[in-house]
From Swiss-Prot:
Belongs to the NAD(P)-dependent epimerase/dehydratase family. HldD subfamily. Pathway: Nucleotide-sugar biosynthesis; ADP-L-glycero-beta-D-manno-heptose biosynthesis; ADP-L-glycero-beta-D-manno-heptose from D-glycero-beta-D-manno-heptose 7-phosphate: step 4/4. This is ADP-L-glycero-D-manno-heptose-6-epimerase. CDD domains: ADP_GME_SDR_e. Its EC number is 5.1.3.20. The lineage of its organism: Bacteria, Pseudomonadati, Pseudomonadota, Gammaproteobacteria, Thiotrichales. NADP(+) binds at residues 10-11, 31-32, 38, 53, 75-79, 92, 143, 169, 177. It catalyses: ADP-D-glycero-beta-D-manno-heptose = ADP-L-glycero-beta-D-manno-heptose. GO terms for molecular function: ADP-glyceromanno-heptose 6-epimerase activity; NADP binding. Keywords: Carbohydrate metabolism, Isomerase, NADP. The gene is hldD.
Length: 323
């Protein structure tokens, strides 16, 4: 059995779908469907079982009631960078992750988990080393603390433990994320609504629309996760991004190019994000390449075109957008 926590979420559901494409249906999805609209992400997937997150946790504590597990993809987390309830964040992203990791270590189950580029704060260097890690928000801190916990354990681990610092992921099955959905998704919806495409104006030394991120298409994220499952001798903490940062304006340009229409409107940078916003990110993926992963990453133009084609072919998912 393969366990995917957060399996009805953005990255988790894409992993489930990719496992199905490999012929795997012996999948246990763990999630919290309080936001019931997330179900659409796994409606076209084949799984063996579903467990609520709290039920799954109780079975971990009891050390019973779970099947034999081949691998765990731990994608379940509170991923809202604007959430400032530190207790909630640490309970979900740190304590829960520790419990699951130790369950896996005790049974020598490969454990692949979601970290985040948010651990680096405002950079400007994005290398998997302590001196570059300065999170700007409690979400980034929760991910950083778990990475630190993993670092202490890795030398003694007798089974695979691999964490992936996701940079700016976009792609299918993210419509439930509301404000945390990607810029590509938001701009697509603005075009459909006949609105101008809104980007932040000048801020932090960057011209309007030129704040820059290492955008990574969901297919690439899934490919890396599955590669590590197939290479269980590889452990560590790895940046997961193309190492090719592009400005937000390139996203807008790709959306306009796909639709054949649209106009950019620059809006004032919001006060609530000042001091807690990454204006530039770019993965150094040397460790990922050194581990042996050699597939190319999608460019923004390539990824956005694929994504918007998927949205156009699956218009029903917009009915499940979180308001």
């Amino acid at each position: 059995m393969i366990v995917v926590t957060g399996g009805a979420g953005f990255i988790g559901s894409n992993i489930v779908k990719a496992l199905n494409a490999q012929g795997r249906t012996d999948i246990l999805v763990v999630d919290n469907l309080k936001n019931g609209k997330k179900f659409i992400n796994i409606a076209d997937c084949d799984i063996a079982d579903y467990l609520d997150k709290e039920d799954f946790q109780s079975r971990i504590f009891a050390e019973e009631g779970l099947p034999d597990i081949d691998c765990v993809f731990h994608e379940g987390a509170c991923s809202a960078t604007t959430e400032w309830d530190g207790k909630y964040m640490m309970d979900n992203n740190y304590e829960y992750s520790k419990d699951l990791l130790n369950y896996c270590l005790n049974r020598k189950i490969p454990f692949l988990y979601a970290s985040s580029a948010a651990v680096y704060g405002d950079g400007p260097t994005f290398i998997e080393e302590r001196q570059y890690e300065k999170p700007l928000n409690v979400y980034g801190y929760s991910k950083f603390q778990f990475d630190q916990y993993v670092r202490r354990i890795l030398p003694l681990a007798e089974s695979q433990v691999a964490g992936f610092r996701y940079f700016n992921v976009y792609g299918p099955r993210e419509q439930h994320k509301g404000d945390m959905a990607s810029v590509a998704f938001k701009l697509h919806n603005q075009v459909l609504a006949g609105e101008k495409l809104k980007l932040f104006g000048a801020y932090d030394g960057y011209e309007a629309g030129m704040q820059t991120r290492d955008f990574v298409f969901i297919e690439d994220v899934v490919n890396v996760n599955l590669w590590f499952m197939e290479n269980p001798e590889q452990s560590g903490i790895f940046n997961l991004g193309p190492a090719a940062a592009e400005p937000f304006k390139h996203i807008a340009d790709a959306v306009i190019d796909f639709h054949g229409q649209g106009e950019i409107e620059y809006i004032p940078f919001p006060d609530r994000l000042k001091g807690a916003y990454q204006s530039f990110t770019q993965a150094d993926n040397t460790r990922l390449r050194d581990a042996g992963y050699d597939k190319p990453f999608h460019t923004v133009s390539e990824g956005v075109q694929k994504y918007l084609r998927w949205l156009s072919d699956n218009p029903r998912v917009l009915d499940f957008t979180k308001k």
